[in-house]
Amino acid sequence: MSKLYLMSLGCNKNLVDSEIMLGRLSAYELCDEPSKADVLIVNTCGFIDSAKKESINAILDLHEQRKKDSLLVVTGCLMQRYREELMKELPEVDLFTGVGDYERIDEMILKKTNLFSNSTYLQSENSKRIITGSNSHAFIKIAEGCNQKCSFCAIPSFKGKLKSREISSIIAELKDLVARGYKDFSFIAQDTSSYLFDKGEKDGLIRLIDEVEKIKGIRAARILYLYPTSASEALIKRIIASEIFINYFDMPLQHISDNMLKIMKRGANSTRLKEMLNLMKSAPNSFLRTGFIVGHPGESEADFEELCEFVKDFGFDRISVFAYSKEEDTAAFDMEQVPFKVINKRLKIIEKIVDEVIEKSFEKEVGQKRLVVCTGKSSEGEFFIAAKDLRWDREIDGEILINESECGNLEMGQIYECEILQNLDKKLLAKALRKVDAN
């Protein structure tokens, strides 16, 4: 049997595409050593400069490691965005494809031909997919592309306009996954709260939530990547009212200064953002994640100081911060740029603030009882079982270390009520109190 090595870079949306490619290539034996693979695939990220460099380095590293007569395939956002340049500059690569042909990857490899469809790939309920990394959780991609016009973002230039999956397609995929034992789902897209806007339906997510709640066997769900102008008050209230969807609110704000929100073409002012955030924060056991960009063209010292004060005071649970990345095909590309030294200085300042805010979020968990899902072996060694707070993103929000149990041996994928005993440098030490369900 031929062996396959697949490297998925970037976001969880890329991961879903990688899992679909794995489904199409199920005849191959997966291996974790590039030097032994007959086919090597890199699913690239092309979002910002650091991600582009990571993708290029990964391609070159795999070329160095691969065996003679193997096939190196490059796909994904970077390839779609810089198709002509990369095909000229990467003779190390055997086959190229973009973001439209994930379900034809097997055909492409068989025929040893490049493929570039004119449209972005949109998953269907019939898409074969091999879930990776969990026996209980899966990401569900509900749409592709984006209709927003943020000044700094090039995603619409290579992902295209918003294209929503039909609700029936999503429900069919969920039912299949539940039948296979998956019970925990994270709904994702470039802009989840714009779901079905392209079909003329506002608040389409509310209807999706209604349908998801009818499926027996789903124990938890969360929605990632809400957008400030497309996430309505009605949607937030519907999430809060749900018995299945967790009060996990992931809304990248990018800034809080009205001046910068206007320059960045975010479509909402600070008053609107704060109203939305306060509604989210009022929900029982709410968990708020956001992201900010510093050093965008037009950002003054006053704008930056306003952002820092807001980050200090609001009380987010998790925050990602990024230095502005100058990207082609964006409105900000031709604006007067903030000097690199200033950007880097601001990034260091806000990173320190964010670190303190996140530390407080972890610290306030001590003494609480939380529902957690066991995820397997811990990064801290054999004496701990790793788990995630059921509210958290499955990849990035942290780790819980269970070293005591009042309910016997713990099972991977199972939910337990735990008491949080201690904060150990952004990892929570916990004791398992009881098994929550027998599923």
Curated annotation (Swiss-Prot):
It is found in: Cytoplasm. Its main location: cytoplasm. [4Fe-4S] cluster 1 binds at C11, C45, C77. SMART domains: Elp3. It holds the Pfam family UPF0004. Its EC number is 2.8.4.4. Gene3D superfamilies: Methylthiotransferase, N-terminal domain, tm_1862 like domain. Residues 132-363 form the Radical SAM core domain. Its cofactor is [4Fe-4S] cluster. [4Fe-4S] cluster 2 binds at C146, C150, C153. It catalyses: L-aspartate(89)-[ribosomal protein uS12]-hydrogen + (sulfur carrier)-SH + AH2 + 2 S-adenosyl-L-methionine = 3-methylsulfanyl-L-aspartate(89)-[ribosomal protein uS12]-hydrogen + (sulfur carrier)-H + 5'-deoxyadenosine + L-methionine + A + S-adenosyl-L-homocysteine + 2 H(+). HAMAP family: MTTase_RimO. Catalyzes the methylthiolation of an aspartic acid residue of ribosomal protein uS12. NCBIfam families: 30S ribosomal protein S12 methylthiotransferase RimO, MiaB/RimO family radical SAM methylthiotransferase. This is Ribosomal protein uS12 methylthiotransferase RimO. It comes from Campylobacter jejuni subsp. jejuni serotype O:6 (strain 81116 / NCTC 11828). The gene is rimO.
